Amino acid sequence: MTGQTVEWKELEPGEYKIALTVTNGAGLSATDEVIVYVNYVGRWSDLSIGGNTSNSPVDIEFSFPSTQNQETGNTIKRAAGELIYPKEDEDCTDVVFGDGNNCRAKIDLYGFNSTDEQVANTSAIGLEQRTYGDCEENTDCVWLQFTGSYHFAESQWKDGEWTMTIRNEMVNDLDIESLTIRLLYK
């Protein structure tokens, strides 16, 4: 038995149609077509984000491709960002002495479409509600999700190169435990 191995490298997330053809020693062959879904998970750990010292927030941007092509069936199902960071800034300096309000960290995720239009953000989530997933007691966990059939549709914000942005509006530099971006195709 002999065969051929095909290796795919550096594929964009999405849907791909492939065909496998098997030919026996007598020259008879059969072909089977399948669809392969290439998903993506990117995780960044131990980040730091600067403080808002000039009355404008500090952003760290992460771009990702999204495809929503109903004609070919190459459609993103979901894009999600998961942000985890410590609740308290460990090297905090009280701006208003004794107040301590600036020591309680609050970092948000913002999502922008391919034309830099803001689609959604986590800023309305209260400090006590930042417990998405398996969030430990001393960390905050926020999640921002976009669904393919709604967010990436032609009638809404469209597909293309989207951006997930970590935003710090606080005065303090803050640590970030991790950011995970997941792209899932059907």
Regions found by a protein language model. Give the residues of each.
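Short beta-strand segments enriched in hydrophobic/aromatic residues
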Residues: 38, 83-87, 168
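Hydrophobic/tyrosine-rich beta-strand signature of extracellular beta-sandwich/beta-rich modules
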Residues: 16, 20-22
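C-terminal edge beta-strand
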Residues: 28-38, 179-181
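Short strand-edge motifs at loop-to-beta-strand transitions and within beta-strands
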Residues: 4-7, 32, 58-60, 148
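Acidic, Ser/Thr/Pro-rich low-complexity intrinsically disordered segments
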Residues: 54-131
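Extracellular interdomain linker/stem segments of modular secreted and single-pass surface proteins
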Residues: 37-45
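Residue-level recognition of secondary-structure-to-loop junctions
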Residues: 1, 8-12, 16
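Noncatalytic accessory or regulatory domains flanking protease catalytic cores in secreted, cell-surface
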Residues: 9-12, 25-26, 110-186
